[in-house]
Amino acid sequence: LDLLQDIFGVITRAHGYCSNRAHLYKAEDTISACFFFENGLPGSGSWCFVGHKSAKEDCIEVIGEKGMLSFSVYNYDPIQLVTSEGRTSIVVPNPPYVQLPIIRSVIEHLQGIGTCTCTSVSATPVNWVLDRILGKL
């Protein structure tokens, strides 16, 4: 959700349904949500953290009037762009240390030689959306 808000703007309305289907732990493991960004763009998402591995899918689809863009969040599958002109695959190499920039930023902040931009204030919009989806607000 933070990636989507970074791309499309702040989510201003959100609602969700959630349940604990597998009872492996206390947290919700199956979630369905719908939301609207500040520009009026609608979005929806479904997450099931206890589904069979044959049903595992990691895909965000952005559908617009000129085509569709789909990409993975956790896997480094090629980005797919589909338009009236056809399908294009865009390969983005896996960075060697994906967490390194945030770790470096935190360390430099603690050493007083930099400023970490990830703060509780910057996390608030995503936390608000999560709480709305989970029915906690």
Could you tell me what each predicted segment is?
Residues 35-39, 81-86:
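Short acidic, glycine-rich loop/turn motifs
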Residues 1-76, 103-113:
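Contiguous beta-strand/loop segments that form the cofactor/metal-binding neighborhood of enzyme cores
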Residues 88-92:
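Generic detection of short hydrophobic beta-strand segments and adjacent strand-loop junctions
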Residues 7, 98-102, 126:
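Hydrophobic/aromatic residues within well-ordered alpha-helical segments
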